């Protein structure tokens, strides 16, 4: 509910000390979870579990519009680059996928691909590793047996620094590999 988080940001600006933590923890969980499309940007409709891992894969125009506004406001308040990035990527998604050639917008993107819910948004381990490598697959929370119904919903369950230490990579190097992999995965 973006309005609740907007309220927290406004309360922080009015001097309520815990309000910013309430907002940023939630914003970070949303952006790092499967609810956020880690490859193509934009938010799925909602999370189906308490870990923010598995989304209902439909993407709604109105949800994404409200979330762009929220992440821009969070960036204005905190100056955390990650919020600007999420807002930008979500706008890019909306313009690329939901805008009609004549300028209007479609109201949503269906959850089903090829007759299967989420098919377009999940990855088999082998395909993910072939394209992006094990370090990136690990950073996206993927597992050889799959983290959801035998396949992998991409999410960011661990901080980049923790994954870098686990994979013996420099955090900046891993961040670069993630960006390269996102572009390659998007082209599939």
Region spans (language model):
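Glycan-recognition and catalytic cores of secretory/periplasmic carbohydrate-active enzymes
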Residues: 1-188
